[in-house]
């Protein structure tokens, strides 16, 4: 599954780079984080996703109201003020997934343009919940992450 987008912020490229190239700062952009452990360019975290709105149509799925997700990632391919790859693996309720998040930044007048693409391998998760539901949940998490990045820049 691939999700991509772009947005522009009214900040210098160095300020944007300072956040996306720092595992500790970038981890703070992720929504609903319960715990974070950072070691250089590596980070491990746990976060929650409120699954009620995605699983409510499944009878007996009330126990899935909050999904606890474990996620380990590494910042790779750093090209200062240009590009970073955040690659990681996660799991929830015994199901595994992997994400490769490519972030490219460029100067546009006095602003910075951020182009991003997330390649996500959902494995059995898409089969269990259905691709549409998982796509919506993943899109929501990605959009919250982008919104949190914008807030950090202010």
Residues of each region from the PLM?
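Soluble, non-transmembrane catalytic domains of enzymes that act on hydrophobic metabolites at membranes
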Residues: 1-2, 6-7, 37-39, 94-104, ...
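Hydrophobic ligand-binding cavity/cleft-lining segments
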Residues: 1-52
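Intrinsic-disorder/low-complexity, polar/charged segments enriched in Ser/Thr/Lys/Arg/Asp/Glu/Gln
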Residues: 2-6, 42-44, 68-70, 83, ...
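Hydrophobic/aromatic beta-strand elements that line small-molecule binding cavities or substrate pockets
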Residues: 33, 70-77, 99-107
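Short, highly charged C-terminal tails/helix-capping segments
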Residues: 38, 147-154
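Glycine-rich portal/gate segments that line the openings of hydrophobic small-molecule binding cavities
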Residues: 38-89
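Beta-strand/loop substructures that line and gate deep hydrophobic ligand-binding cavities in soluble
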Residues: 85-136
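Short, well-ordered alpha-helical segments
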Residues: 137-150
């Amino acid at each position: 599954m691939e999700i991509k987008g772009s947005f522009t912020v009214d900040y210098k490229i160095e300020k944007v780079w300072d956040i996306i190239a720092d595992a500790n700062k970038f981890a703070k952009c992720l929504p609903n984080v319960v715990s974070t452990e950072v070691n250089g360019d590596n980070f491990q975290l746990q976060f929650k996703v409120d699954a009620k709105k995605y699983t409510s149509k499944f009878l007996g799925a009330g126990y899935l109201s909050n999904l606890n997700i474990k996620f380990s990632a590494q910042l790779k391919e750093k090209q200062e003020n240009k590009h970073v790859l955040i690659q990681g693996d996660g799991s929830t309720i015994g199901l595994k997934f992997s994400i490769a998040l490519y972030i490219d930044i460029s100067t546009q007048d006095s602003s910075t343009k951020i182009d991003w693409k997330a390649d996500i391998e959902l494995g059995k998760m898409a089969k269990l919940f259905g691709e549409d539901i998982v796509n919506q949940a993943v899109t929501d998490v990605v959009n919250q992450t982008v919104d949190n990045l914008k807030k950090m820049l202010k």
